[in-house]
């Protein structure tokens, strides 16, 4: 059951209640929500740079966490999250929603069938078009201080897809770039 919604913008949380057909109490203060609503787990869907603080607070309250990717934007934040997981014996799971688009699920199924043979290497390119790419650069994502960078915010989807499709972790990675 949904026991609470927490957002710095209460109107947005009320709108979410309306969209979901729920009547969960709305909070603007995370500490208060954790203390009063006492959730079993929280879903973190905030600006990327805020994830670590929210995750650690929830873990320190004994609450498991499901977070949007990326989990954190800095290495020291990752250390803090891992330490909070260990200290509190709680878990953090990361959501990668690109896995669930029909085309990506189809690729996953095709790769598991014997029809394609064994994959021995991957060359993955992603091109931002004017529709999605332009929109990305108008929102908060464009600010490295809030998203960690285009690489961290966007490319994590693609690294996850390749790992998921192949059921493997990379052995070797190369990158090429140009500012021209």
Q: What are these model-derived regions, one by one?
A:
Residues 36, 41, 47-48, 52-99, ...:
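Beta-strand-loop-alpha-helix segment that lines the small-molecule cofactor/substrate pocket
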Residues 1, 22, 38, 115-118, ...:
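Short loop/turn motifs at secondary-structure junctions
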Residues 1-21:
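N-terminal Rossmann-like dinucleotide-binding module
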Residues 32-33:
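Short alpha-helical segment
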Residues 16-23, 80, 84-85:
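Short, conserved SAM-binding/catalytic segment
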Residues 91, 98-180:
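Predominantly a Rossmann-like dinucleotide-binding segment in NAD(P)-dependent oxidoreductases
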């Amino acid at each position: 059951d949904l026991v609470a919604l927490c957002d710095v913008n209460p109107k947005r949380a009320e709108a979410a209640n309306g969209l979901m057909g729920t009547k969960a109490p709305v909070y603007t203060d995370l500490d208060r929500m954790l203390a009063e609503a006492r959730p079993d787990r929280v879903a973190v869907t905030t600006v990327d740079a805020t994830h670590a603080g929210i995750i650690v607070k929830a873990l320190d309250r004994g609450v498991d966490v499901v977070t949007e990717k990326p989990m954190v934007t800095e290495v020291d934040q990752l250390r803090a999250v891992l330490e909070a997981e260990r200290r509190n014996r709680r878990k953090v799971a990361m959501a990668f929603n690109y896995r669930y688009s029909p085309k990506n699920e189809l690729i996953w199924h095709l790769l598991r069938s014997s029809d394609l043979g064994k994959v021995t290497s991957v060359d993955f390119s992603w091109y931002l078009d004017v529709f999605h790419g332009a929109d990305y650069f108008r929102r908060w994502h464009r600010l490295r201080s809030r998203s960690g960078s285009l690489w961290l915010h966007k490319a994590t989807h693609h690294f996850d897809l390749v790992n998921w499709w192949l059921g493997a972790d990379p052995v070797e990675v190369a990158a090429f770039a140009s500012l021209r």
